[in-house]
Swiss-Prot record:
Belongs to the WrbA family. One of its GO terms (molecular function) is FMN binding. This is NAD(P)H dehydrogenase (quinone). GO terms for cellular component: membrane.
Amino acid sequence: MAKILVLYYSMYGHIETMAHAVAEGAKKVDGAEVIIKRVPETMPPEIFAKAGGKTQNAPVATPQELADYDAIIFGTPTRFGNMSGQMRTFLDQTGGLWASGALYGKLGGVFSSTGTGGGQEQTITSTWTTLAHHGMVIVPIGYSAQELFDVSQVRGGTPYGATTIAGGDGSRQPSQEELSIARYQGEYVAGLAVKLNG
């Protein structure tokens, strides 16, 4: 049995929705045990509420538990072409895992959201840097998801990982095509994890 963690941060719910789609895809794979968790919120509760943050029910992960999984698929909104501060704060607490090599050889993937489409690929590839320092095996999705060839509408999705475009005011929700790419990413990473660890 390969253990897959879908670990995310979401303020307004876009990445939370994508995380559930990633997990749904991963659960299609026989021999994959899939868990969804989120990183802790670092914003004071009153500021989070005032900013319109969405309450989420996923359990909160601890940095130490990352060593328990065979594959981790990270989801983060874009903040100036980088991962969110909450995800960065969480990953900055993994120094002990780095020192012991606890994540070496584990599979890692990334999905993201952007307000206007700017920075989604940069967010994924800049997150890969942290995964590389941990010795994780980075798993992009390439162009194997057919939805990536559809140019009939505005949509996220890259060969690096699933993405969604939330719009400048956050009103646009992930489209069916974006969710399909997210499900594909989950299934693809979980399938590799089962082949390697199952």
